[in-house]
Amino acid sequence: MKNLISLGVFLLILLSVQVNAQEQSVLKIRPTGRILMDGGLFHSDNKNFVDGVAIPDARIGVKATYGKYKAKVDIGYAYGKVSLKDIFVERQFSSYALLRVGNFVHQFGLQSSTSSSMKVTMEEPASNEAFFNSRLIGAMFVYDKNDFFGTASVHVESEALKKKSNELGKMGYGAMSRLVYRPLHDTGRLFQLGISGAYETPRYNSEPTLNHTSFDLGANFPTRIAKVRAVNALIPDAKNLIKFTPEMIAGYGPVALEAQYYYLQVNRKKDFKNYKASGMYGILRGLLIGGNYRYSHTDCGIATPDSGSLECVFGYNYTDMSDTRSHIYGGRLNDVSFTVNYYINKYMIWRFRYSYTKITDRVG
């Protein structure tokens, strides 16, 4: 871990010096970390749901800045495994434009702006898990000025971080973009509309006959204590994937609404029918204590409430991964949730979540 951090900082310094050797800047390094502790009680006919407690995420890392450059290295630990999280360098071209290169979460809809520990529903909506990508090696250009926010990304598949190219056999790639218009982004007055789109080639699969000719999509039940698959669709004979998601934020005073719709299509080879899936979620938020909701330009979304705030969140998610025309039945998911968030201080959050999840029309 020490060697990885040193390499990231060294790369940052090297790039800064090459671009402008005469620029007088100060190197600033700040440690980062996170601990997520969770406990849950379950009622289900599925024996895989066992009551318990867990530490599903622990992080340690470092952020560095030098002039117009920033870098981040983040290492995660969960259930006996160490994994690389954010590893990137970014160059600030102006107060409203930057380029980021490395392994990170690329912008695709509202949920891509917040980390896994900052989801207001405690667990991210199942539709986002099913149709979104996690961290990917690539480059992303960001434009963030006044009423407009836009990103453009190119990337390779997620397995590129874990396996050498000869082990992959082939490397999948893709591109995505997020465009947002936000005419109201003042404290207590929020309104935002946006749309994201993406294109991908088939991904790695350990089964040789499916390797880079398929997509394996799905989502777990909304808990990290017991990891149980809720919906899952394996789409063979795939040529490429396209998807898009419109988004909306509306807020007045201490009340706000967030919503997204997802559409995904896998174009397939030969005479196989294309696979189509969709989903949506809506989140109604209210601050019982803490004043009005504020806007975060950096996240392109609602800012984290102030310390001492108490928030109630009602959520509904629908995910449809069963397509009768292509004869792929990944399942249909309905989830209703209620979450209470208490923002203890700048560094600590206490959450309580109750949810009811139902799965239908799934084969396998």
Where are these regions (language model features)?
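Hydrophobic alpha-helical membrane context
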Residues: L14-Q18, Y69, V363
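Short hydrophobic/aromatic segments of transmembrane alpha-helices and their interfaces
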Residues: N3-L4, A54, F131-F132, N240, ...
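Outer membrane beta-barrel
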Residues: E23-F42, K47-A160, N166-R203, G286-L288, ...
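Extended ligand-binding clefts on enzyme/binding-domain cores
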Residues: R189-L217, I235-D237
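A short, polar/proline- and glycine-enriched secondary-structure boundary/capping micro-motif
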Residues: S83, Q111-S112, K162, R268-D271, ...
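Bacterial Sec-dependent N-terminal signal peptides
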Residues: M1-Q24
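Outer-membrane beta-barrel pore domains
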Residues: D45-K47, L210-G364
